[in-house]
């Protein structure tokens, strides 16, 4: 029986998919798998028995991904599972930035003369007037699951949509509306668009990508939306752009002391994936990924190892090996297995950056001695037998 530990509350809709072969545990030392949402894991010491971590969400900044790869722990996320929830909040953010809906609601709530509120409203409504988003130009930086959904929905709302993503996947490209215009550079987005929304992961290359130079290239009175990661925007430069009028509104899902309560900035408390549907979708996908990995050794949607799939395990002995992506690894594996008289029925090897993953189906079970020899190979971090 495999055991899993939840570091955060995980939807029972997802956990229910584990079935009787799995047991939830509170002890990290007993866990084969960890499910997590927002818990910080960088200071955690992960025991040898942990084989997989599944993040019920897209971002993995709270997980020591590289350290896990070094120790042969496969880290999954759930790309696209919360995409619709985030998309809807982005669309709401554009509307809130275009029409002073929040200001109007607050005025009604705090107006003391409620008896004559209907007449007062007619007099005061002009101060909350705004503009429509239909006919405006929207620039989308990053056309992954969320960005693509925002793009398609915005076209249905009558917006002229421009997309920039030099790394767009084939699947994402197929799902995009034909009306979306392809921008070849960020400068095209900056110079043409009335609204700009960011949908890229946080990396060393994207950290503070929206900086002072970027703001100088944008249209006067642009609306900027950030529902991806807070550190994508240089907020010191943002404040300058707001004060100068270059940026009309900044809408973000990431509260911090610099932006909270500041005029011209609308901040939500990280609500992007805070819907019942998103939480269920993320939990379901995470549990399915964990089960397929533990039961079959397959990897899909890992952030530190390559996708690798050999289907349902029907072999007498299936071995999975996490190892460094260096020469002469496969030959060492096959030499050890061959010397034990073990015949390989099927095998696949995939690599991603510095790490690789190998699945081997044997016609008979490997001995403990053979497994120990595999584990002893320099560059091998974890060897597992699928039973």
Predicted stretch roles:
Residues 1-78, 211-213, 223, 234-236, ...:
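An N-terminal-biased, well-structured beta-alpha scaffold segment characteristic
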Residues 42-45, 166-259, 274:
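Rossmann-like adenosine-cofactor binding region
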Residues 71, 79-137, 301-303:
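Phosphate-binding beta-alpha-beta segment of Rossmann-like dinucleotide-binding domains, i.e.
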Residues 87-106, 152-159, 285-298, 334-338:
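Oxidoreductase and adenylate-handling cofactor-binding alpha/beta cores
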Residues 136, 143-144:
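Glycine-rich Rossmann-fold phosphate-binding loop(s) that bind the pyrophosphate
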Residues 147-148:
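N-terminal Rossmann-fold NAD(P) dinucleotide-binding loop
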Residues 250, 263, 271-387:
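NAD(P)-dependent dehydrogenase/reductase Rossmann-like domain
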């Amino acid at each position: 029986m495999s055991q899993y530990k939840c570091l955060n509350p995980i939807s029972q809709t997802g956990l229910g998919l584990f079935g009787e072969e799995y047991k939830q545990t509170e002890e990290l030392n007993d866990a084969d798998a960890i499910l997590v949402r927002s818990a910080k894991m960088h200071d955690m010491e992960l025991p040898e028995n942990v084989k997989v971590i599944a993040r019920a969400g897209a971002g993995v900044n709270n997980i020591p991904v590289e350290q896990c790869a070094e120790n042969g722990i496969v880290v999954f996320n759930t790309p696209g599972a919360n995409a619709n929830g985030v998309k809807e909040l982005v669309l709401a953010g554009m509307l809130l930035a275009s029409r002073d809906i929040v200001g109007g609601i607050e005025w009604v709530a705090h107006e003391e003369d409620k008896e004559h509120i209907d007449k007062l409203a007619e007099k005061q409504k002009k101060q909350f007037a705004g503009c429509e988003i239909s006919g405006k130009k929207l620039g989308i930086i990053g056309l992954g699951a969320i960005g693509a959904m925002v793009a398609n929905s915005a076209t249905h709302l009558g917006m002229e949509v421009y997309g920039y993503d030099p790394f767009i996947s084939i699947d994402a490209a197929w799902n995009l509306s034909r009306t979306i215009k392809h921008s070849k550079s960020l400068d095209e987005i900056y110079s043409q668009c009335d609204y700009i929304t960011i949908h890229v992961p946080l990396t060393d290359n994207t950290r503070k990508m929206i900086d002072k130079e970027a703001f100088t290239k944008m249209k006067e009175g642009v609306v900027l939306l950030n529902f991806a990661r807070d550190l994508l925007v240089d907020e010191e430069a943002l404040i300058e752009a707001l004060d100068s009028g270059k940026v009309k509104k900044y809408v973000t899902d990431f509260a911090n002391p610099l932006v909270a309560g500041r005029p011209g900035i609308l901040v939500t408390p990280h609500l992007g994936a805070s819907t019942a549907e998103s939480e269920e979708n993320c939990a379901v996908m995470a549990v399915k990924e964990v089960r397929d990995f533990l039961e079959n050794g397959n990897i899909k949607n890992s952030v530190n190892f390559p996708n690798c799939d050999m289907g349902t395990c029907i072999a007498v002995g299936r071995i999975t090996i996490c190892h460094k992506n260096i020469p002469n690894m496969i030959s060492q594996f096959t030499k050890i297995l061959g010397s034990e008289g073990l015949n390989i029925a099927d095998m696949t090897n995939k690599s991603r950056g510095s790490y690789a993953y190998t699945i081997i189906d044997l016609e008979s079970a490997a001995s403990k001695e053979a497994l120990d020899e595999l584990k002893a190979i320099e560059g091998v971090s974890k060897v597992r037998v699928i039973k």
